[in-house]
């Protein structure tokens, strides 16, 4: 599916400023694509990143089979997101070429180790 078609198929969620999308450690597996607005990713009460339109968040659980969320995600302003269901993400990952999955997971694992080591 083309990225531009996502909002034709999936639900859109609107967050108000300072509304929490998800908390670190939560176990739901939905992903999100930001349509408008910005989301802060917070780890240990430190803002690690601010994401904006076109960026995707909340998908690490599916890619790594993690049990919980790595960050808390908070809207910096009114924000519209497309909800990417966990089953949809799992289906996409399961159909990916095994070599590409290996490369992607290796890169993400290295990134995650770096982030955890830099705290």
Task: Give each language-model segment a name.
Residues 2-3, 22, 92:
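Residue-level detector of alpha-helix boundaries and kinks
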């Amino acid at each position: 599916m083309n990225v531009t078609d996502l909002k034709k198929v999936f639900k859109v969620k609107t967050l108000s400023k300072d509304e929490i999308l998800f908390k670190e450690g939560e176990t739901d597996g939905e992903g999100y694509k930001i349509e408008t607005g910005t989301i802060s990713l917070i780890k240990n009460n430190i803002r690690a990143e601010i994401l904006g339109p076109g960026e995707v968040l909340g998908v690490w659980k599916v890619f790594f089979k993690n049990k919980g969320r790595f960050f808390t995600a908070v809207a910096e302003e009114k924000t519209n997101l497309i909800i990417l269901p966990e089953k949809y993400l799992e289906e996409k990952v399961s159909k990916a070429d095994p070599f590409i999955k290996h490369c992607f997971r290796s890169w993400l694992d290295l990134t995650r180790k770096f982030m955890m080591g830099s705290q």
